[in-house]
Each structure stands twice: as structure tokens, then as C-alpha cells.
Regions:
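Active-site flanking loop/helix segments enriched in acidic
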Residues: 2-26, 58-69
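Divalent metal-dependent phosphate-bond-processing catalytic cores, especially two-metal-ion Mg2+/Mn2+ enzymes
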Residues: 12-41, 54, 91, 107-180
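Conserved acidic
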Residues: 19, 44, 70, 74
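An active-site-proximal "capping" alpha-helix that borders the catalytic cofactor pocket
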Residues: 27-30, 72-88
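Membrane-helix interface segments
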Residues: 42-44, 95
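His-Asp-centered metal-binding catalytic motifs of divalent-metal-dependent phosphohydrolases/nucleases
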Residues: 45-67, 78, 82, 100-107, ...
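Active-site-proximal substrate-binding core of FAD-dependent oxidoreductases
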Residues: 93-100, 112
């Protein structure tokens, strides 16, 4: 299946939940953009985009089973749900295994073992921060402790910390001027 076909399948799977659909499209768009800017090879890009589209596939099930969509529940339940979802897509076993791994780790910021994993974390963070209006301090913390790609860092700065670099340069200039 093409990425567009997987996206369509996931939209159908989402059963009209506009919040979930909007979020997966945001994450996919950011992941696609960062992956392309970082120059991922086509196979890794496809795996990344598929993982971005399906990363929250367990949310409907978690809402029913647990009454919430906490990250740990998404990671636990997401593996088997995305495995079933990927059947019949024509994705080879190794690629499907990687997508399953990414979906079942997309809230774990330690042990990042590839550009696809790193970019998925960054894309999901940007989308969540936008949707939930997280404070700038959270973005600065993520930027310094989790963000790893140059493209992801640029997008975080531009989207979540607009004007921050200019303000930092201005403050630095004022400090230099007053310190002379």
C-alpha cells in the first residue's frame, strides 16, 4: 500500500473521531517534513510515515479499556493493534516489525535507536504541544533534552518558540553591552 492508502485506511479505522484524525495528520505531516529535510532513504521514510499515521492506533481501545489514553497504555496495546492493521498492506515483515516497534515506543524518549524513532518523537511532540497549548518552557526542555535532528529543532523553534532566537540574541547583545 502507498502512504496515502495507509492514511485512508487509518482514517476509516478512526471511525470519524475528528480529534484523532486531525492529530494523526499533523504528526504525519511533521514526520514527513522532518524526514525529507533530514534526507532519509525511501524505505526509512515509508516506515516513518506509516508509524506516524498509526502511532496512536490504540487510543480508541485505551479509552474503552482504561478510560484514558496514557502513553504507557498506548505503547502496550498499540503493538498488537498495529500488527493487525498492517496485515494485507503488502508491507514486508521487517518494515512492519519496525513500525510495530515505533508505535509501541512512541512515548519512550530513552533508547532512541534510529532517525525514524527520533523524528516520530519530534513530530508527535510538536503536534501535542500545539494542540494542548503547552507552555514554552516545555518546548525549551524538549529541545534541549530530547530533540535530536536539526530539522526537528528548527521546526520546534519556529512553531513553538517563535521569535525566541531573536529575543535570545537581543538579550545576549544587551548583556554584552552592559558588561563592557
Amino acid at each position: 500500500m502507498t502512504t496515502a492508502q495507509i492514511l485512508e485506511k487509518m482514517i476509516v479505522f478512526s471511525e470519524g473521531n475528528l480529534h484523532d484524525i486531525d492529530h494523526l495528520i499533523r504528526v504525519w505531516t511533521y514526520a514527513k517534513t522532518i524526514g525529507e529535510l533530514e534526507g532519509l532513504d525511501s524505505r526509512t521514510q515509508y516506515i516513518l510515515e506509516t508509524a506516524a499515521i498509526t502511532h496512536d492506533i490504540a487510543c480508541p481501545y485505551c479509552r474503552t479499556k482504561y478510560g484514558n489514553t496514557e502513553g504507557r497504555h498506548q505503547e502496550e496495546e498499540g503493538a498488537w493493534i498495529v500488527r493487525d492493521f498492517l496485515r494485507g498492506t503488502g508491507m514486508d515483515e521487517a518494515a512492519a516489525g519496525r513500525v510495530i516497534y515505533l508505535v509501541s515506543h512512541h512515548h519512550t524518549v530513552t533508547g532512541v535507536d534510529g532517525a525514524d524513532y527520533q523524528i516520530l518523537l519530534e513530530a508527535d511532540y510538536i503536534a501535542n504541544a500545539e494542540e494542548n497549548h503547552w507552555p514554552e518552557e516545555n518546548a525549551r526542555r524538549f529541545l534541549s533534552s530530547v530533540a535530536g535532528t536539526e530539522s526537528g529543532k528548527r521546526l520546534i523553534r519556529e512553531i513553538l518558540l517563535p521569535g525566541q532566537e531573536e529575543a535570545d540574541r537581543t538579550r545576549a547583545g544587551q548583556v554584552c553591552e552592559s558588561g563592557s
